């Protein structure tokens, strides 16, 4: 709780004093690092491995139990090394399971990515890119009232922004 938060803030202060800038929620980089530049310019991305400057929507997993991301969803290779080897020898691939993205998954994924990378998200803008009606999402943002009352976020005209230091 509070002790862990205080530790994180002490570490952040030390890193910032040493010339690092905060990237997203849990990374730091030197001001001239490509991640820091991407964060400042609004082109930072995040995948399940962390923050990145790479906008590619494909991430290929190699080896037993690896997870990959393709435009249509996630795939995971066989977990056990013997099953992985047998599958590769037999079929050339060891994909053991997959999860296909729905349009809603893609929409929610971009919303989460923007919040994690930019600390703000423009719901109407993202909905327009996904040919989705923003009305329900904007209405659901009213459920964030407690966070807004606590000064952690602001919600204005469909834009949700995390307050600095929240």
Label every model-predicted segment.
Residues 1-132:
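C-terminal scaffold of the Radical SAM
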Residues 23-25, 137, 157-158:
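Residue-level detector of family-conserved "landmark" positions at structurally sensitive sites
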Residues 29-32, 143, 164:
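Short secondary-structure capping/turn micro-motifs that flank functional sites
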Residues 43, 144-146, 159:
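Intrinsically disordered, low-complexity regions
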Residues 133-149:
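Short amphipathic alpha-helical interaction segments
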Residues 148-158:
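A short, conserved structural fragment
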Residues 156-166:
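Accessory beta->alpha helical hairpin/"wing" motif in late/C-terminal subdomains of nucleic-acid enzymes
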